[in-house]
Swiss-Prot record:
Region entry Disordered, spans: 19-63
Enzyme class: transferase
Phosphothreonine PTM positions: 387
Annotated EC: 2.7.11.1
Protein name: Serine/threonine-protein kinase gad8
Modified residues (Phosphoserine): 527, 546
Modification after translation, per record: Phosphorylated by ksg1 and target of rapamycin complex 2 (TORC2), affecting the kinase activity of gad8 in a nutrient-dependent manner.
GO terms for MF: ATP binding; lipid binding; protein serine kinase activity; protein serine/threonine kinase activity
Source organism superkingdom: Eukaryota
């Protein structure tokens, strides 16, 4: 779900929907230009395929009830400044409204904080829920102190990440990238033993020094959620069905994205199945590069989805501003997206709507795939579907031809997206939709002169028109094995141990500067829905919407089994 709730082609039966021979309609994308062909270099190896199968073994698991994870970031010691980094000037001010609010010190009293903007800050992330905490004005650059306590809602298992940064003398560059230096980070696997306090010094990876962290898990009263559990902060997106608001959960102070949808509008547009599919996918999937569902609930007139608030901006926003990305940056995003799509395919889900508007960046620059309204569920490897949906410039040839399509359709759109990142436009883009469809089906794939040879070969494989010959038709591992990804350590990538090539300028969890002011300037409110006279039968279709599930604890870290409470380095 792009926060804009962008409009896409509604799913209909393909035979009556394409109309390639009818009068062309004009379609404007915004900023970009390019075209497509086949051939693939498939570096498949029996050893890698076998290893991939072993990596997907069912992990050990334990069940834990929803609860609260209390994290206290105390201090760090022996940090070192990267060579060549110019730190921010002592005493430079920052808008206090952007800083994390004072939290309880454990006894119920608010802690007064004097922030030092020029000292290292820490980004704490649990299940894609991120907070930024500035150091106290009582410490040094090498030995900063935060003495900060945060409480996270636990709705499923997730690792806890803590990354330390230091602002530079120019914190925000002209391209919107944060120039802040990475000083090191850790990743912890929390213990979910009730009321057991862990307190340890943990060595940083990617830097020098250690960080002291305390964790305590407490069960939570599982009372039904309502809109009253949230403080409405900002509107960050709108659509025909409703809107998306930035909210603060009152009991934990965590920031979320609350998507509200009017039942009557969903029913009148025959979108019930799509809406239920989105919630189903979000509830099932646990992947570091997919926006997680925290809760869902409903009222007689509305449906509500509570998701992690990812505020680094849409990839579309960054791509539009910069025109295109360098090859490494594009590779990094495509690699993380590949892992996300592979996860969906293992759940027998086809995504079908991959595009820059549906990809968000988090605080640190990792991607988060969102908007699952066009997903197709229960699609085994060889299953085919014939429905027509997606966004025009990303549609695969087999979809346009009405031949039916499989999961392999997602690899075509991955290729289109990579091409767009590198060149600035989708390969067959045209303002006339019907002419664009013709190009997708008939035109050769052409490349600008400056494209990397390995990237060309990968794109030729992904953009092969015959789906059975397309790179990835044998599974995601085929794509991972391509020479374009030779310098990617997939295990480190999945563990988010590779520093992103770009870090958005984000000041805090409530910063909305990467969102359209058209939305953020609007007063947030949960509008009253007039009596829609929905029948009991219609209401029954939403009977299982509300979601606050027990969590299955996955004690595996990619390949290796990690005991709960251990440090992941």
């Amino acid at each position: 779900m792009s926060w804009k709730l962008t409009k896409k082609l509604k799913e209909t039966h393909l035979a009556s929907a394409i109309g390639l021979n009818s009068g062309g309609s004009s379609f404007t994308r915004g900023l970009k230009n390019s075209t497509l062909s086949s051939t693939s270099s498939r570096k498949s190896s029996d050893e890698k395929s076998r290893k991939s199968s072993e990596d997907k073994r069912s992990p050990q698991s334990t069940v834990v009830q929803p609860g609260l994870l209390q994290v206290t970031i105390i201090e760090a010691r022996n940090l070192k400044l990267p060579s060549g980094h110019v730190p921010a000037n002592y005493g430079v001010s920052i808008d206090n409204s952007l800083l994390a609010p004072p939290l309880s010190n454990g006894s119920g009293h608010a802690r007064s904080r004097s922030h030092a903007w020029w000292l290292p800050y820490i980004v704490v992330e649990f299940d894609k829920n991120e907070i930024l905490v500035d150091a106290l004005n009582t410490a040094s650059l090498e030995n900063p102190c935060w003495d900060y306590q945060a409480t996270f809602d636990v709705s499923r298992y997730s690792k806890l990440s803590l990354n330390i940064y230091l602002r530079s003398s120019s914190s925000r560059s002209r391209n919107g990238m944060g120039n802040d230096a990475f000083l090191g980070g850790i990743k912890l696997s929390p213990s979910f033993i009730v009321n057991k306090l862990t307190d340890e010094w943990v060595p940083l990876h990617g830097g020098s020094g250690e960080l002291r962290v305390q964790m305590l898990y407490k069960p939570n009263q599982s009372t039904p959620l309502t809109i009253d559990a949230f403080e409405l902060l900002k509107v960050v997106g709108k659509g025909s069905f409703g809107k998306v608001m930035q909210v603060r959960k009152r009991d934990t102070s965590r920031i979320y994205a609350l998507k509200t949808m009017k039942k009557a509008h969903i029913v009148s547009r025959s979108e019930v199945d799509h809406t239920l599919a989105e919630r189903t996918v979000l509830a099932q999937v646990n992947n570091p590069f997919i926006v997680p569902l925290k809760f869902s609930f409903q009222s007689p007139g509305k449906l509500y989805l509570v998701l992690a608030f990812v505020n680094g901006g849409e990839l579309f926003h960054h791509l539009q501003r910069e025109g295109c990305f360098d090859t490494y940056r594009a590779k990094f995003y495509i690699a993380e997206l590949l892992v996300a799509l592979e996860c969906l395919h293992e759940f027998n889900v086809i995504y079908r709507d991959l595009k820059p508007e549906n990809i968000l960046l988090d605080y640190t620059g990792h991607i988060a795939l969102c908007d699952f309204g066009l997903c197709k569920l229960n699609m085994a490897k060889t299953d085919r579907t014939n429905t027509f949906c997606g966004t025009p410039e990303y549609l695969a040839p087999e979809l346009l031809l009405g031949h039916g399509y499989t999961k392999v359709v997602d690899w075509w759109t991955l290729g289109v997206l990579l091409y767009e990142m590198i060149t600035g436009l989708p390969p067959f883009y045209d303002e006339n939709i019907n002419e664009m469809y013709r190009k997708i089906l008939q035109d050769p794939l052409r490349f600008p002169d400056n494209i990397d040879e390995k990237a060309k070969d990968l794109l030729s494989g992904l953009l092969t028109r015959a789906p059975e010959k397309r790179l990835g038709s044998g599974g995601a591992q085929e794509i991972k094995n391509h020479p374009f990804f030779d310098d990617i350590d997939w295990k480190k990538l999945c563990a988010k141990k590779i520093q992103p090539p770009f870090k958005p300028s984000v000041e805090s969890a409530i910063d909305t500067s990467n969102f359209d002011s058209e939305f953020t300037s609007e007063i947030p409110m949960d509008s009253v829905v007039a009596d829609s006279h929905l029948s009991e039968t219609v209401q029954q279709r939403f009977a299982n919407w509300s979601y606050q599930r027990p969590t299955t604890i996955d004690t595996s870290d990619d390949i290796n089994t990690i005991a709960p409470g251990s440090v992941i380095r």
